[in-house]
């Protein structure tokens, strides 16, 4: 029974992959070992027809991941640990301080580029999509924002190349 389930799951995944656009396929191929994480997001929103807009949103995000990255490596890890010691520093001030190494060439040489497409985790992306949809559908200031504008302006999980962060949690009630 378990073997049949695995085979069925593999066939469904293989079939659904064949329905992907060439752009999405190219991004999934480029993602390397992180492909499974991205496919988890697509699978998550492929289960229920009520999630069809969320599936389109997840495809939009994944297709647009190439070129988006953050910096990592031992220096950044140490820097973030030091930043974590600032217990009473407001969230937004910490975010500004966190960006300092990105703006100085001397620091940048000590940092590794971590491309979203190769590092982002499914749980993070699903969480961001859920909160974005919740904010889009429940906030009065979003009235009249259609899906295309939502995707472009409200859905993205980052602004530039700042570290990946659960920033939406800081503005959710």
Where do the protein language model's features map onto the residues?
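N-terminal accessory/pre-domain segments preceding catalytic cores
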Residues: 17-173
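Bacterial Sec-dependent N-terminal signal peptides
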Residues: 1-24
